[in-house]
Amino acid sequence: MIEPKAKPRARTNRIGRHLPTSGGLKKTLRLAREQGLETVQLFVSNPQAWAVPAPRPDAEAFVKGAPEIELNPVVAHAKYLINLASPSPEHRERSVYALAVELVAASSLGAHFVVVHSGSHVGSGEEGGAERLVKGLIRARRLAAAENGAAELAEPLIENSVGAGTQLCSTFDILAEVAEKAGVRVCVDTAHAHVAGYDLSTPEGARKVAGRLGTTLGDRLALLHLNDARNGLKSHRDGHERIGEGCISEEAWPELFVRLPGVPAVMETPYVTPEVDAEQVRLVKELAGGLPLAP
């Protein structure tokens, strides 16, 4: 395991991880508390199936309990099946509806964000795929807002891809363009960025990447998916490793944190045990500047 070398400073990034909900949302809250999470991500339904999220009997307890242990933001991850950029009208419509339903379901749990993959143009061309993605995001939000009424609606965040095949939004420029046109913000996955061509294998590279994020995305950057990369630079192959066990330099993390102040970070790294996972959270907090959050 890596040890932080950065000089302690006031930490502004809230640190969390993706947690399972299979044992119930009360268990999710317990794990979050035991691991010292300050933000959390979860699925509101089976990410590999089109089934509509079922009402959660423990939703009220979660909505009450998350603020009590200062989980902020609460993040949901949308289904992997969603492809708003698909050239297939049937798949696209199903994706729009699925995202709308998940926005409403996430809102019922008090979630602030729903991360959705940017999808693929499936060989129909990047320009057309990006246009469909923008329209799909706008339509899904409108459908969800109509269903949710006056209640506060979770905000969709579009995520960068690894750039494999016909995937969209592997570059920050395209990600920013889509986000601006759709009126949404973004989630940047560090592992995706590295394998897509943004070099995080050195601290110098991390400084440049953070600079690019600042100039292209600015305030639209709402969340980091903090994952080490299983595969190398420009490999365009997805795969997450625990922090310090992949291809991203151990000295890159402090460079990102100091240049992206206030951006919450959620790990989607492999589970080991609750105790080992808690130690990983502690490590990342130190890499981000120190254990206590700045007031």
What is the role of each PLM region?
Residues 261, 269-277:
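Flexible, acidic glycine-rich loops studded with aromatic residues
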Residues 1-78, 82, 86-101, 290-295:
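N-terminal pre-domain/capping segments
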Residues 68, 84-188:
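Active-site acidic/histidine proton-transfer and metal-coordination neighborhood
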Residues 18-22, 45-47, 78-81, 119-121, ...:
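Active-site beta-loop-alpha junctions enriched in small/polar residues
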Residues 90-103, 126-139, 172-177, 207-211, ...:
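Short, electropositive alpha-helical surface patch
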Residues 40, 139-241:
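Acidic/histidine-rich catalytic cores of soluble enzymes
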Residues 13-19, 38-42, 74-78, 114-116, ...:
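Hydrophobic faces of well-ordered beta-strands that scaffold small-molecule active sites
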Residues 8-9, 30-37, 54-75, 100-110, ...:
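Acidic (Asp/Glu)-rich catalytic clusters
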